[in-house]
């Protein structure tokens, strides 16, 4: 009893204790060809511009991890290439510059715009016009083998809940009657044995 408790407590402690940050995120590394004194690594903030050094560096895009439905997209810099997000004026300005980086405000605006868009997407029912059009396009692309099965399903009337519960009640009554018949048979046998 104590061993599983101790093991589960240990697993929870390991899972919940803060771990040291990833070294790849701590520093960008030395600039090639330049000698630098050893520095203490500082965590990076993806929405803040990196500190500028004396020598010019190539601009690097910062990744933003964004959850879209059940898939994760890794976007570098701006999020205007997201399939679910239309181009906003801020993101179209970002795409215009060849080596320009998005400002922190634009990056956060893009992130939250796409996140809100995903949260506010209407849930489509199976009989909505958009869902019917999507199914029609899928059938036109190669779902012809499902047509006979779908026709067969549409011919059968749907089973209502009342009918389902009625059938369940009848099955339970039949089982109860069979159990009573078996009990009566065993009682008869017992009475025959005792009566002899």
Curated annotation (Swiss-Prot):
Xref: SMART domains: CRF
Propeptide: 25-153
Signal peptide: 1-24
InterPro entries: Corticotropin-releasing_fac_CS, CRF, Urocortin_CRF
Record field: compositional bias (Basic and acidic residues): 146-156
Disordered: annotated span: 32-61, 85-105, 136-158
Cellular localization per UniProt: Secreted
UniProt function note: Hormone regulating the release of corticotropin from pituitary gland. Induces NLRP6 in intestinal epithelial cells, hence may influence gut microbiota profile.
Name of the protein in its database record: Corticoliberin
